[in-house]
Amino acid sequence: MEQRLAEFREARKRASLVAQPSTSSQSVQTSGAKAEPAAATPKTATGWLTRFLKRKANPAIAQAQPNQPQEAGQQLPESTAVPLPSSCRQSFLTNITFLKVLLWLVLLGLFVELEFGLAYFVLSMFYWMYVGTRGPEEKKEGEKSAYSVFNPGCEAIQGTLTAEQLEQELQLRPPQGSRTSPSCSSYP
């Protein structure tokens, strides 16, 4: 935070040096207090700072515009990224789902008219089962799986087999350390 404040002050100083010649060509101001904010205006200043300095320069405009927050700390800088609210994303997914169901109903009605309604219904049920069994999106960062919810740390549970032990039990793989499987050694 202190680094950003130092960068802002440095940019403001550089901008004030650039802005000083342009302010002298404007109308002559009577007091030094009014000249200081106009000279300190950086060219890259946007948003609340520009509006504030315009109001200071023209008091008539300041009275016509509604009051805005006085402190700079109340507003976010424009360069920071603000994530979209999750309700917007949720409503988008809801709208897509609604449109899919509506399309399915329209196509079902069309195929019923063409006397292929049952075939369309059965095939579409396979599709909906496929869509329902796969996740709508990949697992999010930090999201817990169903296994890790009941077994935090994913520790081995007493009495369960590992994949290697299960393969050995099913005799799909020879036990570790031996080159041939016991079932193969009994055949000549």
Curated annotation (Swiss-Prot):
Recorded phenotype for the gene knockout or disruption: No visible phenotype; mice are fertile, with no differences in sperm morphology or motility, although the cauda epididymis contains slightly less sperm.
Q: Where in the cell is it found?
A: Endoplasmic reticulum membrane; Cytoplasmic vesicle membrane
- Write out the ranges of the annotated region (Middle helical (MH)): 86-100
Q: What is the lineage of its organism?
A: Eukaryota, Metazoa, Chordata, Craniata, Vertebrata
Tissue note: Enriched in testis; predominantly expressed in round and elongating spermatids.
Q: Where is this region: Disordered?
A: 1-43, 60-80
Q: What is this protein called?
A: SAYSvFN domain-containing protein 1
Could you give the subunit structure recorded for this chain? Associates (via N-terminus) with ribosomes.
Member of which family?
Belongs to the SAYSD1 family.
Q: Which organism is it from?
A: Mus musculus (Mouse)
Per the record, what is one GO cellular component?
endoplasmic reticulum membrane
Intramembrane segments as residue ranges: 101-121
